[in-house]
Amino acid sequence: MTSTQISFPKIFIGLGNPGEKYNGSRHNVGYHFLDLLAEKYKAPVFKSESKLFGSLSKASFEGRKVLLFKSSKYMNQSGESIRRFIDYYKLSLDRICIIHDDLDLDCGTAKIKFDGGHGGHNGLRSIIHLCGSAFFRIRIGVGHPQTKDVINYVLSKPSTEAVSYTHLTLPTKA
């Protein structure tokens, strides 16, 4: 896809793990970012859509109507709900943007990327396996642990000072 072919995504999908236990964890930064978008753009409350394995809301960014979707599958099975969502709405993969945590970026840093590998992220691995890789991603940095205990790090809550990703905003142009 060349820069002249890139169009604004129609669906923003936040990755995370369902349940109170994981609220506020680094791994749930995708959910959190969607909540911030919904609040900023006055979107209705997310409504559970069991047939899609997730919760859905609608918003308007700069006059563009978009869907906001939170997968209710655990991170490692995210591809199942994304596949179902794409099939249900008959979407091409390049119309979605996956929002996820990224250990390789400093906390509070965000990067937009189109296509590519999973970079060790099991949620992306699941999506790429079941759907392909030609989608947008907003990678939100959560920093890297000082130890090799990555699982406990991403499933834990960051310190208050580290939660600078709450001030990120969505670019209006890709």
Question: What do these predicted regions represent?
Answer:
Residues 148-164:
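Short, electropositive alpha-helical surface patch
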Residues 71, 142, 157-160:
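Active-site donor-binding loop signature of nucleotide-sugar glycosyltransferases
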Residues 120-123:
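Hydrophobic alpha-helical segments within soluble ligand-binding/sensing domains
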Residues 2-114, 125, 129, 134-136, ...:
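Nucleotide and nucleotide-moiety/phosphate-recognizing core
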Residues 166-174:
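Conserved small/polar residues in nucleotide/adenosyl-binding loops
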